Amino acid sequence: MILDIEMLRSFYASYSESVKQAKATVKRPLTYAEKVLFAHLFDPSELRPYKRGVEYVDFRPNRVAMQDATAQMALLQFMNAGKDKVAVPASVHCDHLIRADVGATQDLPEACKTNKEVYDFLKSVSQKYHIGFWGPGAGIIHQVVLENYAFPGGMMVGTDSHTPNAGGLGMVAVGVGGADAVDVLTGQPWELKMPRLIGVHLTGKLSGWATPKDVILEILGILTVKGGTNAILEYFGEGLDSISTTGKATICNMGAELGATCSIFPFDQNASEYLRKTGREEIASLAQKNAAELRADDEVLANPAAFYDQIVEIDLSKVEPHLNGPFTPDAATPISHMKAKGPANDYPMVVEVGLVGSCTNSSYQDLARAASVARQAYEKGIQVKGQLIINPGSEQIRYTAERDGILDDFKKIGALIMTNACGPCIGQWKRHTDDNTRKNAIVTSFNRNFRRRADGNPNTFAFIGSPELTVALTIAGRLDFNPATDTLLDKDGNSVKLDAPTGFTFPSKGFAVEDKGFIAPSEANANIEVVIAPDSNRLQKLAPFAPWDGKDLVDMPLLIKTEGKCTTDHISMAGPWLKFRGHLQNISDNLLMGAVNAFNGESNKVKNQLDGKYVEVSTAAKAYKAQGISSIVVAEDNYGEGSSREHAAMEPRFLNVKVILAKSFARIHETNLKKQGMLALTFCNKDDYNKVQEDDRISLTGLKEFAPGSKLTVTLKHKDGSEDSFEVEHTYNDTQIAWFKAGSALNFAAKK
């Protein structure tokens, strides 16, 4: 059954005409990303040549997807909007709250028991408001979306930063915070800064151990974690033909690590085949009829430099297997360089655990190719040195892989098969170790490798590679093992080599599944009661944030001046804290606990200016809030890099932090801060960061004249009585300033 088929038929009936009208209006050929963007304007009459990276534009996405950890807050906000049903097709996916411990057979029932209150809430809200519900064990949100919902030319938002995964099937798919999702769910315009366009020209063909994962790992080394901010990466060139749809999804998925708005591939025969193999023949046919407008125009491809803001050239035939890390996904290292780089940087060279899965690499093809490496180890009698853990991407993939013997190939070398869920990728991993502070190395096919992220150990050096390389390094037990050139010993002491991985893109017998774990949207039913117990520590109804009082912010204590990388993991940790994602008061206890204090080099230890004692960040914030005192956070570049979790914006707002002053922001987090009525400001001169001292009282003036393009003034009152003043800037437009004045975007919408 094709889900939401009437919406899809209606969309394709008008798509090509919308694109043609857009070309006539802007009077030039269009890139593929532009075609999709212009076809989804909230008000088509406002179409014009928007300034990329500058102007905000209102869009009308086709659908919304939410994972269970972020859906709670999104749907709590939606419930306050007073709507009878969602305005567009939507789905909830229970994938984040399942912990990987001993294996799927025991872990899934335990998760259902532990998270029953949250699952019941999400299920009842879904049934009440006409939302599709994918229960625990059904699979990882982005793999399920690719298999069931993604379609060429469409636009979707998702409350997860790796929503761009659907770009592998030709969608503009953007990760957002819950408040943005609520805009779409309630039928309001969804606002986005018109993205810059980075064209990625692919030539050649992958071979040997090189994979689509290595393409994006190489691009991360080129562009870095900030290089894609406020941009769409659009892929083109003859190299596209040799990459499968799931491989393209992998590349789009990790565009999030570049800070990109999203990434997109054009519709082609691989996409058509994927749609047909996943039971969506009619969509493939509809897309084929619109194929000319599901790709960049010929004039663009003939002279890409005239249409893209930046061009990146990648020769696939020269791409090597990469191992990116540790601690940041843009530390790109070809595996052939690791023998020199590892010892030079004092990396722990023994690979203790290899983890295959995540929304990035858990497709049938991923598992089949990784299993071909595992099968060689078994057949050649190679002793596996590390522990191997597998998370399939969906129940359909797990069932099919089990039928085809793929899971058996992993089990024969001692692999542990976990639930169809995120698990270790987001810190939902009960790692069995005798010392959770010991320096060690793990290799994963995941997307992020921030310190502490996987297992909570700050001394775990996590490296990212392809599933195939992850399995090979786990077998070898060495970080510097190059499977293309190095050998291993078999049980008889003979040197043997691993052959390059092989594996079918699609199962030869077709996909199969007994129970997808899906409850289709029912008619909206106002009689369904959504129960939230008053004494619950997992769920809490939201109270509106207070509006701006019309005054400047004077003598705010510095809550923390963070040093170095400060991701959403540092601001609002996942792992054991995921259970509080529906309870703002409780989860606020983890505020900035991973951030490094610039004044002492420690995490979660800041000075409370009221008594001079050093306490946890949330403790200091609560002390200020109890006295009615607003506070401020000062940070470095790319503040809020990482996930879409709006808790990283709601927690400081809840604890009366009014301002985040940073050198620069990650896109999603900056929007989330604005949505929650906070001030996200940047230094005009980044060196002014160095003027901020630990005991400063900080004032922000000029708010009565707060306007697009205006500057505000920060004054630092130092402990010795001296002062420093400097200007700060912002990217707020008129609507976003109205959010600030109303107290939040939701407050503003409620007043309209």
Labelled PLM ranges:
Residues 3-4, 68, 151-284, 382, ...:
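Mobile "lid/hinge" segments at catalytic clefts and subdomain interfaces of large enzymes
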Residues 42, 46, 51-60, 74, ...:
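Terminal amphipathic helices with adjacent charged low-complexity linkers/tails
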Residues 8-11, 15, 20-195, 581-633, ...:
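Long, structured ligand/cofactor-binding scaffold of large enzymes
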Residues 488-505, 670-739, 746-749:
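Acidic, glycine-rich flexible loop/linker segments
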Residues 76-80, 306-401, 405, 523-659:
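Non-catalytic terminal/interface segments that mediate subunit docking, oligomerization
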